[in-house]
Amino acid sequence: MEESNPAPTSCTSKGKHSKVSDLISHFEGGSVLSSYIDLQKDSTMNLNIPQTLGQPGLTSSPPRKFLPQHSPQKQENDPDQTQGQHGCLANGVVAAQNQMECEDEKETTLSPEMAIQTAAASPDTHVLNGERNETITDSASSIANSHDENASDSSCRTPGTDLGLPSKEGEPGMDAELQERENGVNTMGLDTLDQHHEVKETNEQKLHKIATELLLTERAYVSRLDLLDQVFYCKLLEEANRGSFPAEMVNKIFSNISSINAFHSKFLLPELEKRMQEWETTPRIGDILQKLAPFLKMYGEYVKGFDNAVELVKTMTERVPQFKSVTEEIQKQKICGSLTLQHHMLEPIQRIPRYEMLLKDYLKKLSPDSPDWNDAKKSLEIISTAASHSNSAIRKMENLKKLLEIYEMLGEEEDIVNPSNELIKEGQILKLAARNTSAQERYLFLFNNMLLYCVPRFSLVGSKFTVRTRVGIDGMKIVETHNEEYPHTFQISGKERTLELQASSEQDKEEWIKALQESIDAFHQRHETFRNAIAKENDIPLEVSTAELGKRAPRWIRDNEVTMCMKCKESFNALTRRRHHCRACGHVVCWKCSDYKAQLEYDGGRLNKVCKDCYQIISGFTDSEEKKRRGILEIESAEVSGNSEVCSFLQYMEKSKPWQKIWCVIPKQDPLVLYMYGAPQDVRAQATIPLLGYVVDDMPKSADLPHSFKLTQSKSVHSFAADNEELKQKWLKIILLAVTGETPDGPSEHLATLNNLPGPKKKSEC
């Protein structure tokens, strides 16, 4: 863009004198704009030109905001004229267009006329506190026209350079940038003063707002009291006088609600109404509250009987149809807001803490020197005492509301709505099934005196859960179990039932154990029989002791842990010999061994299916038949696995039969015999292999499974396969000793006995 040629000095001087004279003659009458020019004149008297022109950040005092006297009618003038007017910045800052004018005026001081000229050069826009306000007037437009008429030569100026300012077209962003800089400095002092003035006004306004809020909430509260007293109470009393139910029940529910309503509607509310009308002359509320606060003691009677009143409403609604009909009819009305009677009964309980909160806020805004300070402080002390009782009742009511929600979630089948019941924790959890290895979704509700073990109910409407078991806190014990296949597990052992549960995470598990422990400890503290609830895994046996049979729910042995009846040792199958659990000891038995019933104390004395042994212990009947002497196969797997040279699952194949997974054990007490079980908890071995004399082949063929080995003797061939090479070598180490009659501890007694036999019998050796 081409730069404008500098204007001659004579033209510039002539333009200045004509403009100054026009401005003085035009604003001699003292308009709003002239006062603004005077302000600019005072602020620029001591400023020199180099400081003003060279440093845009240094400006005069902030200009005052003024309104135009006339509507902007000449804003759509010739663009060239308007553009020249817009080139001036707010607050009297002038930027030189070219170096010649700056050098001519470097040593001159800014005169009042120059300040007037600067302020009037751009009357259309001013930036004040970050806001741009239009200030174009008819008078201001005439100034521009007069300026143009007095210019003798058009060559003395170019568009946008009336006062030596840079052209807008040349540097379009410079104007806005300079305005932002000077506004940041000029408005600082003004903002500080405004903020101080605003804070002073805000405290007074907030005191008025608090008093207004107290009045408005008091009006709404009185309308709720009228609903309780004049609608619910009167309608139910009318129905009671008809003989539908005793009137005494209605009086117990509403207590002294009529007295409370009379106090607020006839005394407190009228006093507040009158005071707010006189607020300009008497801006205080502490004296009213201090005078009437002692009457709030009448709430003590209402709060004291609140729990029983809510429980009575629930009972009457369930058992008396007329009571239910009247309350439901009122609750349908618009004035109730679709809220229940219990909800409206909570209003007086919540009102006292509301007074306390508003009064505390009022004292924070009130100056200690105020005449209302002492009255407000005394009234707060009285109200705080009453509020402490209300807060306790509110907590109980909130807990009761939660109990009602749970009551509905359970299909209104469990009687849990009782003020003595307190919800401690709830949440989803997984239950490890005894009949299979699956984890089933469950939901727990932990209260201060019981645990509800629930099953989710999949329905669009109605209840969400079904209570499967209610386990009492009394006698409950917790065990933190460790299961590699199922992490984050723990066991709840109660008189009614034992549950093995799996949490979603270790943190969730710890939270449940902590909540259960605290509930158990608190329960025993209330009954003065404190004892630790969390015990180590070894502190609680997996099986119920003989003394506790029928008194404590057992832990059920999982179906996949056994393959045969734990009493008669017969193998299970899906058709003729299915699995059953003894409800007394938790063992898995067949139908023959569970064909007994006994009364179990933990199940309320009801008859339950039990095994033969438990039946004899619980009922006291003894079997005269002597127990059979156990054979070699009748050694329990758990008995030998705990004291063995080696034990693990192995794949096993005999002759042309398919591979099957079995539990193999070489016990320390019989190290030359390999016991094979269907599962680790089986009480009887499926087969045994005396290892002495067998040939070991640890080089499997290509058709065999990896990590396999064979035991061969005559026509008997037993094939085994381990899960990995390490486990295979562990087995081979023990078996290679056993086939030669040796043990890890030394020569076997079996081999010594064999060597002492007569000659002919030594043919059995390999």
Curated annotation (Swiss-Prot):
Actin filament-binding: annotated segments: 1-150
PROSITE patterns reported for this sequence: DH_2, PH_DOMAIN, ZF_FYVE
The organism's place on the tree of life at top rank: Eukaryota
Subunit structure: Homooligomer.
Sites where the protein binds Zn(2+) 2: 582, 585, 611, 614
FYVE-type ZnF: 559-619
Main location: cytoplasm
Ranges annotated as biased composition (Polar residues): 47-62, 70-85
Phosphoserine carried by residues: 702, 716
DH domain: residues covered: 206-393
Functional description taken from the UniProt entry: Activates CDC42, a member of the Ras-like family of Rho- and Rac proteins, by exchanging bound GDP for free GTP. Activates MAPK8. Plays a role in regulating the actin cytoskeleton and cell shape. Promotes the formation of lamellipodia.
Identification of the protein by name: FYVE, RhoGEF and PH domain-containing protein 4
PANTHER family: FACIOGENITAL DYSPLASIA PROTEIN, FYVE, RHOGEF AND PH DOMAIN-CONTAINING PROTEIN 4
One Pfam match: PH
Organism: Mus musculus (Mouse)
Binding locations of Zn(2+) 1: 565, 568, 590, 593
Tissue-by-tissue expression: Detected in thymus, lung, heart, skeletal muscle, small intestine, liver, kidney, spleen and testis. Expressed in all parts of the brain and in the spinal cord at embryonic, postnatal, and adult stages. Levels of expression are lower in postnatal and adult tissues than in embryonic tissues.
CDD domains linked to this entry: FYVE_FGD1_2_4, PH1_FDG4, PH2_FGD1-4, RhoGEF
Zinc-finger as UniProt keyword: yes
Domain called PH: residue spans: 422-521, 643-740
Subcellular location: Cytoplasm, Cytoskeleton; Cell projection, Filopodium
